[in-house]
Amino acid sequence: FDGLGGVLTGPFTAHPKIDPDTGDWHSFSTELKSGSVSYSVLSKGELTFYQEIDQAKPSSAFVHDGFLTDHCAVFPDLSLRFDAGQSFKEHASAFYYDSDYMMRFGVLHRQEGSDATVRWFDADMHGHIWHTVNGWEEVDADGATELVLVAPVFTSYPSNVPIHSPQEPHAHLYKFRFNLDSGALVDKRCLLQHFYERPSINTDWLGKQTRYAYLLDEEGSGGIMGSGVLKYDLLSEQAIASFDYGEYRGGEALFVPRDNAVEEDDGYLIELLTSDKDSALLVLDAKTMTEIARLTLPQRVPYGVHGCWLNSEQLQSLQA
């Protein structure tokens, strides 16, 4: 593991945001010892920016994911908190959900560099976010710039953090809209009541206005991984199509763009499916949500989440 010359002393984020225009990696990570959040930018493997951001104490338990837009880097400050002192109490955990702590978003202007200060945008609700869908900027009818953030939000969470298990509460898909100048919450709406999580998008649209999100159905699975995937239109706010995994369970339907694709949904969804008996690699047409191929693997693969796709050019660059 690379600590980048000792600058990164804590954990690195599970979900760096890669700017599709520059290839730079933007990451937010939680430093549990200090309670701070670190924001780092890597360009071609070199650390080009690093900043530590103090949090209210007790600190947010996790910053597992964040947002990147054309001009902003955004991280959530969440109602799931971390307090090591809690773990010394009988049957207690260092993690606890504080419904009195309102969720907010820390917004940094990317162009300000080392002079950037965090602006806090209040979400007007308590909540916890594991994974984000996307964020972008829009100009409203009056010419004001709005910051749009979309993510599944949990409004409760047990202290034993039972992620990917039947004890995990349900998340609901929310869209937040803020005035970027004032930080005021313009609109907040729940798009889906059904439990969808671990979203996927065409990352060529990361930070841009995104129409399509691919959401893992965790309600139909009884909380054990995902039972299928939903294609959802974020602009019309309507479900388009879904694909059911049947007796299998999946971890994340990863979007892979087709070569020379023009349209946002021109590509594939790749999913690793597992049952009690075997495992299979599933390939769906992301435009039609129909099955293209299914390859039964020679050995059952245990349940897992998250993955990445490397094309032949990227693989060759790693081998160079």
What are these model-predicted stretches?
Residues 1-320:
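Beta-propeller domains
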